UniProtKB/Swiss-Prot annotation:
SUPFAM superfamilies for the chain: Phosphoglycerate mutase-like
Organism: Pelagibacter ubique (strain HTCC1062)
Protein name, entry field: 2,3-bisphosphoglycerate-dependent phosphoglycerate mutase
Its EC number(s): 5.4.2.11
Binding site for substrate: 8-15, 21-22, 60, 86-89, 97, 113-114, 182-183
Length: 238
């Protein structure tokens, strides 16, 4: 039995402000830090030995993982991968979700947020929120940096990394923890749970709540559960 643990970062500053965050680097709130520490405690209680830790390039996921590793007293350096980043929200980046609903209409914003293949307008490359203007992304080839993304785009990006980097480790009975984001975890769940394009748009991922997935030798899911049942969301699986 192999274990895969998926953790969406704890509440971020822009989660609290209801702003579209995407690839912008914002940190955790006080509540987000508490969620991350609590996630570490839940993971510690499982007594699972983690072989590899992964996070996105983004501070909120990196710091969530740091709190978890501190709780586990594990000082190993995690693998940071931009491919695990949140979905890029294009021209919506930095804007308030409620204000955009009033301006563009609730249906249009819902389509941007929850549809499978609809993407917002691209973010101008001169905008300070564009990844090309953020220092942490200078190491990424420019052709790999998006101006906007749909959930499908995010799925394609995340899954290429998962198949190339993570899947074989799981097949070799290595236990893995990934600290990432709502949409990058949604992409992983689509693949692992075999959710169709409509069903995946309904999946909600809570902040700072570890999702433990137990896999058999053929990578089939034997069991999956949120470790904090008080804040669990419907996995839409069974």
């Amino acid at each position: 039995m192999t274990h895969l643990i998926l953790v969406r970062h704890g509440q971020s500053e822009w989660n609290l402000e209801k702003r579209f965050t995407g690839w912008v680097d914002v940190d955790l709130t006080g509540q987000g830090k508490l969620e991350a520490c609590k996630a570490g405690e839940y993971i510690k209680e499982t007594k699972i030995d983690i072989d590899y830790f992964y996070s996105s390039f983004q501070l909120r996921a990196i710091n969530t993982l740091k709190f978890i590793q501190d709780t586990l007293r594990d000082k190993r350096e995690p693998v940071k991968a931009w491919q695990l980043n949140e979905r890029h929200y294009g021209a919506l980046t930095g804007l308030n979700k409620d204000e955009m609903k009033e301006k563009l209409g609730e249906d249009k914003i819902h389509a941007f947020r929850r549809s499978w293949d609809i993407k917002p307008d691209p973010l101008n490359r001169n905008n300070p929120y564009h990844p090309l203007n953020i220092e942490v992304y200078k190491s990424i080839p420019k052709e790999n940096i998006p101006d906007t993304e749909s959930l499908k785009d995010t799925y394609d990006r995340v899954m290429k990394f998962y198949i190339d980097e993570i899947q074989m480790k799981l097949k070799n009975d290595k236990n893995i923890l990934i600290s990432a984001h709502g949409n990058s975890i949604r992409a992983l769940c689509k693949f692992l749970f075999k959710l169709d394009n409509q069903r995946i748009t309904l999946l909600e991922i809570p902040t700072g709540n570890p999702l433990l997935i137990n896999l058999d030798s053929k990578q089939n899911i034997k069991e999956c559960t949120y470790l904090d049942q008080d804040r669990a969301k419907d996995l839409l699986v069974f």
